[in-house]
Amino acid sequence: MSIPHIAPVPHPRDGYYATNNPYQVNGPKGFTEFKYLEETHDLFVRLDFPGIQKESVIILLEPSKKAVIVTGEAPKESKHDSSHRKYGTATGLICDCCEISNIQCFVGDGVVRLILSKQKINLRVPIFCSCKITNLQNVLFFCLIFVGGARMPTDASPNIIRGYNPEDLSVELLLETSLRCFSIVNVSDIFHGFVLLIPIVAVAGGHPLAHLRGLNPEGCRGTDPFDPAFTGPTIRPHPSVLEGSTSAYETKQLSNGGLYLRIDMPGVPSDGFIVAVDGNGVVTIMGRAPATMHDSNGFYAMNNPYQANGPKGFAEFNQERDCGYPLTLLEPSKKAVTVTGDAAKSSKHDASNRNNNIHTFVEDGVVRLILSKKKIYPHAPNFCSFGGATIPTGDAPVADGTPYVNLLAHFRGLIPKGRRCTDPGDPAFTGPVVLPHPSVLEGPMMPYETKQLSNGGLYMRVDMPGVPSEKFMVAVDGDGVVTIMGRAPVTMHDTSGRTYVAKVANVPRGYDGGRIKLVPKHGVIRLTIPSN
C-alpha cells in the first residue's frame, strides 16, 4: 500500500501561521528579519536560505559601499530532490551621507545572519539624516534593494569573499582585504532574475519596502517578525530563490509505495529534529530552532510555554447567534455566571489539588459554555453584547441611566475592534513571560511542575488543555532530549485546534524511551522518567 502524503491545510479563518512556511507554528515569521541594534547602531539581518552550505556563500560589497549582495547554493542532497537551489538577495543604505564599513556573516542550519556597520562620509549633512534613528521621525537606515533585472555599475570591479570562516575573520572593511578578494566578470548575472518584492510585501504597510516595518511609524527599530501581515491563506514562494524550487516542501511517491519528503525548517540544528508516530498512524516531524544571536524570541502564548499554535489566552469568548443552553448557577442579578471546578491531585507527586474558578461541556481539561440572553430593557439600543463588549460611539445609556461599562477589559478582543468575540490570536498574548493562571483559586498556578525523585528520576506535570489522552506523544531524540507533543482538536465553537510541544528533560544517549511512564488525563500529562 502506498504511503499517502498529508498536505498542509490553512486554518479556515486565519490561514497559515507563517506564509513563508506551512509547517511553522510559532516564532518569527517571514523569510527575513531586520533589527536595529541600539547599543552599536548596526543592523542585524536574518536570511532564511534552507539547505545552504557555508562554503558556497558569497558576500559582495557594491563599489559605492551602499549595497551588500549575498548569494549561496543549496546542493541536491538526495536523488529524489527535484533540483539544487541557488539563493540571492541584497540589502543596503538609503542615505547619501554614510557607507557600509563592516560586514560580519554567520552561516548555520540554513540561515545566513549578517551584522552590517556604517560610517558617515559626508560630515556636512545635518545630524538628522535618513540613516539615523531618532525618536521623532524614525527611519531605519538600511533597506532591501531587490529590483528585477537591475544591473551593477560597470566602471569599477566589485569585491567578493568566498568561503571565509566568520570565526577567523569578521571581514573588516571588505575593500581592504585584497588578498581574499577577486573580481566577478559578469556582475549582472548576480542580479539577473531577482524577484521584485513589492507585490509580495506591500500588505505589511504603505512603504514600497514595507516588509521593513521599521520604515513605518508602527515600528522604528526593525521589522516586526510577528506582523499579522505574514499570516494568511496562501504560502508565498521564496523570493530569494534564483534557481530551483521556491516551495518550502516537496513530495515524491516512490515506486515501492514509499513516500519521500523534503521539508524546509531553517534554523533547526541537525540534532533538533524528532519524528513520532501517534496511535492513529500519523507521522509528525518536529523541529525547534533556537534563538541565535539577535533573533527575535518569546513565548507564542503567555498562558503556556509549551503551546506552539492555535488560540492563545486562558479563555476565549465567541458570540454566536441562535444558540443557547439552560444555566443553573447564575449570579442573583442574572448578569454573571460563576464557574468553579476542582482538579484532583492525580499523582502523589503533584504539589496539591487545584480549584479552578455548572459543569456543562467539560472535556480534556476545558470547560465550554453557551450562554443565552434575553432583553429586559426593551428601550435600550438594539446593539448589545455579552460582558466586556463596548457599544458604538454615541449610543445612549441603558434604560436605568447607567452607561455601558467595560468590566472585562482584559479581554482585549472585545475592545474596540471585536464586539462579537475575543481575539485568541492577539499579539498581546505573545511575550517573554509566562503568566500564572488567573482562575486558579487553590494550588499551583503555573502550567507545569517538576520534582526530582529520590531514586534520581524526574516527575513532571504539564498542562495541555484540550488534548485527548490518545493524542499525546513522547519521543527521545539522538541527543537524549525528551519531547512531549499534544494536539488539541477543534471542539464546538473553538477558533481552531492547538498544538503543544515541550522539551522537558535530558537523558543519556541510547536511553530506552519505553521506560518513561505516561499518565495523560483531563488535558494534563504526567510523566515519570526513571534514572538510567
From Swiss-Prot:
The protein's name in its UniProt record: Putative 57 kDa heat shock protein
Organism: Arabidopsis thaliana (Mouse-ear cress)
Domain of life: Eukaryota
InterPro entries: A-crystallin/Hsp20_dom, HSP14.7/HSP23.5/HSP23.6-like, HSP20-like_chaperone
Family: Belongs to the small heat shock protein (HSP20) family.
Transmembrane regions listed in the UniProt entry: none
Domain sHSP: from-to ranges: 25-134, 439-532
